[in-house]
Amino acid sequence: MQMISPRMASGMQEKQYTPSLLSFFIYNPTFGPREGEEEKKILFYHPSDVEKNEKIRNVGLCEAIVQFTRTFCPTKPAKSLHTQKNRQFFFEPENNFWIVMVVRNPMIEKPNKDGKSQTIEYQEEEILDTVYGAVVRQCYSMYKLFNGTFARAMETGGVELLMQKLEKFFYKYLQTLHLQSSDLLDVFGGISFFPLDKMTYLKIQSFVNRVEESLSLVKYTAFLYNDQLIWSGLEQDDMRILYKYLTTSLFPRHTEPELAGRDSPLRPELAGNLLHYGRFLTGPLNLNDPEAKFRFPKIFVSAEDGYEELHLIVYKAMSAAACFMISASVELTRDFCEQLDKLVGPQLTLLASDICEQFTINRRISGPEKEPQFKFIYFNHMNLAEKSTIHMRKTASVCLTSVHPDLMKILGDINCDFARVDEDEEIIVKAMTDYWVVGKKSDQRELYVILNQKNANLIEVNEEVKKLCATQFNNIFFLD
């Protein structure tokens, strides 16, 4: 991606280029061990139009790097390779299956004084291994969510089936990667939870129990409001990647106007005396259509004996969404979908209304929101809870931030420091732009704060962070 910054006079401009994907490939070194069979190792290669010998050469180089680094650390070979122009990331998700992502470093194109030639400056220090390493792991997790493991495809249909699945999935998925907006949130891969009072939470729990009792086919349920999680019956790691898919891919494709409450229905349908405007986000677009297809995406989640395959039904009313997961061995029919629609639609509409009203009341009590002097990111490693006032909104795969990239880089650097040690610690940085950046790590929790107080000193900054902890995290203990 290119950004132009007009820093030079007389029509001469600097061009800034953000990080971009150069190549992405998956190989298994055991598939073509003999000379002349090297191409058999390559299971997927993007871009596909690269000449065959170049693919073989690039994969061979990666094999050599992995083997070389294995001599120093047999259990943890290469993770990344830094060069002036690009950075390579290595990940072995399953035995002998390697994923490699090559990212072009950000660069600045500067015109020379003669106006003809140009000087290129590569900014290799701007790329963080932790961030882009996390992006590679996300790619595999997303593939596994919809296809199961590489080994499963091999058992079912051999190398040919695996290559077909990789091509089908990654051809589309890699187009949604926006590497220029990857940051600390990719490292955490957390879940944003919706704050609720006990009474409303109990209503939701009761709703989930009623649905699972009435529709015995439903094995797991997840409940979200406004793209934030309220309830989940899945394991944490499964919910983490499903949440990523829902909030960055599925929901943005089905946006609808926000509703103020139950008095302003979008397209009300009466079901008895209850408003009903629930709809399927996966599966049939319109239940009244005689040609409607009752096919749902299948997902793979962890189970006691490895994994289980499930139908994913996502059903939405207003800003509330319920995900129902049903064993893939069951065939879902029109009758079942109509039964679900009739049962869930009115109840979900009412619940969405109640949550909206409760949220509005709470906001009124807390008073008008003033532009705070600080922005923060919070993450809890134990329950994957994540909260950010730095990220304004998510669109399909893009997270828009409200602070300068230089400050996001500092947050990433602090996170790298935290990852190196097990002890709790605090780091305070004064940025070149006069912002203060504070990182606190305490008892499996991390808090990052950006303060816009250029005249403050260390003591004042420390006091501000204490105030923030007292107001935003009053029930969470942070060590001083």
From Swiss-Prot:
Entry annotated with the keyword Mitochondrion: no
Predominant subcellular localization, coarse grouping: membrane
GO cellular component: lysosomal membrane; Mon1-Ccz1 complex
Top-level division of the source organism's lineage: Eukaryota
tRNA-binding as UniProt keyword: no
Key words of the record: Lysosome, Membrane
Subcellular location: Lysosome membrane
Biological process annotations from GO: vesicle-mediated transport
Cross-referenced InterPro entries: Ccz1, CCZ1/INTU/HSP4_longin_1, CCZ1/INTU/HSP4_longin_3, CCZ1/INTU_longin_2
Recorded family membership: Belongs to the CCZ1 family.
Protein name: Vacuolar fusion protein CCZ1 homolog
Gene: ccz1
